[in-house]
Amino acid sequence: MKLMIFAGLVLFAIVSLIEAQAEHEKPCLPEYKVCTHAPGNCCSDLVYDCYGRYKSGAQIGRNCFCLQKGVIYKREN
């Protein structure tokens, strides 16, 4: 009987620890999601990539996105 109670308490402690750890993890950002203010939150299969925005030769801002690793994006005219 004591063994069953002990096993139940150990199981409860393990489940509680797993739930607490999951609550503290930040959800990752999916592909093409803007991550300018959260650079480390892209999902593990994605990379953080930034692009400068220019007007009349002067930089007016910066956009960052979560993009696929190894993919090259080119501007279309």
UniProtKB/Swiss-Prot annotation:
Pfam families in alphabetical order: Toxin_35
Primary residence: secreted
Signal peptide start-end: 1-20
Single annotated GO MF: toxin activity
Assigned keywords, A-Z: Disulfide bond, Secreted, Signal, Toxin
Disulfide bonds: none
Residue stretch(es) of the prosequence: 21-26
Post-translational modification: Contains 4 disulfide bonds.
One Gene Ontology cellular component: extracellular region
Record's subcellular location: Secreted
Tissue specificity annotation: Expressed by the venom gland.
Similarity field: Belongs to the neurotoxin 19 (CSTX) family. 08 (U8-Lctx) subfamily.
Protein name in UniProt: U8-lycotoxin-Ls1q
Organism: Lycosa singoriensis (Wolf spider)
